[in-house]
Amino acid sequence: MSNHEEEIEELAQRIGKIEVGDTKSDIYQKVLNLIDIERYEHALKIIEKYLGETDAVYERAYCAFQLGKEDFSLEDKQFLQHLQAQKAYRLSDFSKALKIYEHLENDLPEQRADIRVNMLAAASQLPGLQLNNAVSLDDQDSVFNLATRYLTIGDWNQAIELLSSSLEKLENSDSNSEDHKSQINLCRLQLFFAYLQAGDNEKASKESLKISKDCLDETSQAIFVNNLISMSIDNPYISFRDLHGTNLEKALSSLLASQKKQFIRNLALLDMAVGKQRSVRKEKKRNPEESIYFSTILLREETKSLISPKKLPGYLENLFKSDSDNIVVALLLMQHKISNGNFRGALSIYQKLRTSLEASQSLSVLYSPGLVGLGDALHYKIQSTGFKSQLLHEAANYWRKQQSCEAKLLLCTRSLLAHLDERAPVSTIQDDMSVIDDLLQWKGPISELVSCKVAALCYLDKEIESGMDKYLVPTKDLITGIDVDDIEIRGVPVSAAIGPIKRSVEANSSNSSKKTRKRRKPTPKSFNPKATPDPQRWIPKRDRTNVKIKSKGKSMQGGVA
């Protein structure tokens, strides 16, 4: 147990200690204090032991929910839905959180304003989702969430403009409360991040100097230091000291799942920069879902000890033989063979890795988009004629049975397009379209899904649904700045052509550019096929009777005639 955890435990024992003479209100206040420091188990024990069934009902349900226990005795089901939405948001399942908030908006019209703020917070993390309701720019929380949405879709200028105007309003306010100061610094922190993403390090540095760390909570402090490190890491030891000077354990427990994943990766890179390989190995055991990432940075450090780079292939071969399901080693070995043009060798490594992953039931890794794409590319290199994306379709069949995720989005869309190219049966296309519809409900009408659905509808000779055209880029925008007449005259460039079209273009261009040369005759010009052959042609010239030998004169070579 770390020092911080020991301090929290001591604090929990102190503030949660029930003394003689404590009233129900005193005990209730101690329960609230325990919930504030996230000691839900201790708080729930006090509620069950010292308070009645009708006391602290919501606190009881909240603690039970945080501990993974469902409290069905609570009649207020909307309160539980609020908790489920918060949990989904913390786990970065923003689509699920948004659906729950939509139900709550219909069931609780009196709380519609607050619920819409939460809905905007969840929608801001979904880049393909269209915002149906207009956002009020008078509400600071709504403006902050809208700016976060612009950051998600990469519109840095809009985010900077919104955050700057919001910051100006907050600074002109007369309030001097701690919450107000915290809100100003939080807005500055987001503006600092927006400048970083836009590549304006000068303004980002100026904004960082205005942030008061004392007014930020522990999680925001860790994020602030992490952003400072990403702006400049001249001395990794100072960066390591500054980051570990914050309460990392508290920050990691409060971050969203997607933020926590990136934060753990940054910490591992910083540990490697200061030579703390042992701590990285410990983190690898704590986070098995990130084992591939940790193995990569550890292996990169291990290979530095090799005397010569020529020993690297043998080193990787030995590692792969000892651990055939080590994905990092297998990928490095395949990369080395591909760079040398040995595609069959790379494919054999891939097949061995596939066998190992199937034996260990690591199907989520086996059917990950990167590995599937690599396997398909290797098969295509070796068998280009009559190639079908069998690996891609296998992976898509696996992911379509799983919950909606990025891997399902990537592979199922590509599988549908591959089926269209392969002229698959109508039933197969319809099955693929049902998965696309599920993904549209999860991710929203993003361009990949809309284009796939439109392509499938055209293949099935069906009308495109009304309303989908607004998510497609108009043709006039696609051809802006392009001379269509010139392209029609010149033809399709080889670099832009795909598959059989490219091969036919190359064949036509090669035939037209070649000059026809006359074939040289196998006989000399003076050759007469009707002439009688010389019977002495096989005898040396000096021995022939029909050849006059040149006589040698007494005069010197080059003399006067």
Curated annotation (Swiss-Prot):
Region (Disordered): 505-561
Alphabetized SUPFAM superfamilies for the sequence: TPR-like (SSF48452)
Organism: Schizosaccharomyces pombe (strain 972 / ATCC 24843)
Main location: cytoplasm
Compartments where found: Cytoplasm; Endoplasmic reticulum membrane; Nucleus, Nucleolus
General function of this protein: Component of the signal recognition particle (SRP) complex, a ribonucleoprotein complex that mediates the cotranslational targeting of secretory and membrane proteins to the endoplasmic reticulum (ER). The SRP complex interacts with the signal sequence in nascent secretory and membrane proteins and directs them to the membrane of the ER. The SRP complex targets the ribosome-nascent chain complex to the SRP receptor (SR), which is anchored in the ER, where SR compaction and GTPase rearrangement drive cotranslational protein translocation into the ER.
Subunit relationships: Component of a fungal signal recognition particle (SRP) complex that consists of a 7SL RNA molecule (scR1) and at least six protein subunits: srp72, srp68, srp54, sec65, srp21 and srp14.
Key words of the record: Cytoplasm, Endoplasmic reticulum, Membrane, Nucleus, Ribonucleoprotein, Signal recognition particle
InterPro entries: Signal_recog_part_SRP72_RNA-bd (IPR013699), SRP72 (IPR026270), TPR-like_helical_dom_sf (IPR011990)
Protein name listed in UniProt: Signal recognition particle subunit srp72
UniProt keyword annotation of Flavoprotein present: no
UniProt record similarity statement: Belongs to the SRP72 family.
Bias type Basic residues, positions: 514-523
